[in-house]
Amino acid sequence: MAKRTAVELIALQCTGCKRRNYTTSRNRRNVQEKLELRKYCPFERRRVLHREAKIK
């Protein structure tokens, strides 16, 4: 079996339309809190806060 690494894949979910527009990775050892970024949402056509969500 593969070893579990500290880097995990996450999705960034729009707080306005609740869609998952972006995927990225983060290191669990370096970043303890949930990731929040202002990114462009093509469905709302503006920059909106995106929060970290698990990839299903």
UniProtKB/Swiss-Prot annotation:
One GO cellular component term: cytoplasm
Keyword Ribonucleoprotein tagged: yes
Domain of life according to the entry: Bacteria
GO biological process: one example: translation
This protein's UniProt keywords: Ribonucleoprotein, Ribosomal protein
PANTHER family assigned to the protein according to its UniProt record, in alphabetical order: 50S RIBOSOMAL PROTEIN L33, CHLOROPLASTIC, LARGE RIBOSOMAL SUBUNIT PROTEIN BL33C
Similarity annotation: Belongs to the bacterial ribosomal protein bL33 family.
HAMAP family, A to Z: Ribosomal_bL33
Name of the protein in question: Large ribosomal subunit protein bL33
Gene name for this UniProt entry: rpmG
